[in-house]
Amino acid sequence: MRIVSGTHKGRLIHPTSNMAVRPTTDFAKESLFNILNNRIDFEETSVLDLFAGTGSITYEFASRGAKDITAIDINPRCCEFIRTTAATYGFLNITAVR
């Protein structure tokens, strides 16, 4: 998995094998964000990522400059992974909630 566009374009995301998730493919993310790019101003947007899993969509919004992002997942491993990855990439606008 990778971040498709924005300030962190091309950075890889390496989820641990103990997370029972199916991450959104790069192709699907690229298609989704091509549509959103023409409709919203990311810098003025607050995002709620439900069922965040690995945080793939969360990081994509952060890389594109979303104002603040809340990622929610029931799995504590997923939330911890999102927090760790956000800190690694310097995304200060991400909050992970279980």
What is each stretch, according to the model?
Residues 1-98:
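Class I S-adenosyl-L-methionine-dependent methyltransferase catalytic core
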